[in-house]
Amino acid sequence: MPDILHRIGMRNTTSLKVYQALSSQIGLSCWWTSDTLGTADQEGQSIRFNFGNEAITIRVLELSPNRHVLWEVTDGPAEWYGTKISFVLKEEEDFVILLFKHMDWQAPVDFMYHCSTKWAIFLMSLKQYLETGTGAPYPKDQKIDNWN
């Protein structure tokens, strides 16, 4: 099964701040989509991310403070259903490194290509949010094609 993989490094932040941006409703709404409902700070919780007429619901599978967040997609686009999204944090020199993986796609369809690019854009929004205090969550994100 194909996966989407990205690596970004962030300066002037801490693993704790990155973890909070990945595991709180407020943090997630500052870099992914401003229309975020629910809580993501405990295992088993669900959170819904709205993107206009589309939505994605995830369940938090694992939380390891300042180190790892793992989600499972429970509702949303058919291609996303049952996939898992992992964020692994580590510190290297004066960077917090984020290793991102959106795994278990059934096939490398056109939508996966689109989502790979959009994940890169949203991860850059996360980096911007943590380094400057202002991200570019949906609907302020960069548009890349006719699907958004």
In which residue ranges do the predicted regions lie?
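A short, structured loop/turn motif at beta-sheet edges
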Residues: T14-L16, L61-N66, V88-I97
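Beta-strand/loop substructures that line and gate deep hydrophobic ligand-binding cavities in soluble
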Residues: G76-I121, L126-Q128, P137-P139
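Glycine-rich portal/gate segments that line the openings of hydrophobic small-molecule binding cavities
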Residues: S29-D75
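Glycine-centered tight beta-turn/hairpin loop motif at sheet-sheet or coil-to-beta transitions
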Residues: M1, N53, A78-W80
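Hydrophobic pocket/interface hotspot
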Residues: V18-Y19, L28, I47, V60, ...
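Hydrophobic ligand-binding cavity/cleft-lining segments
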Residues: M1-G38
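Short, highly charged C-terminal tails/helix-capping segments
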Residues: Q128-N148
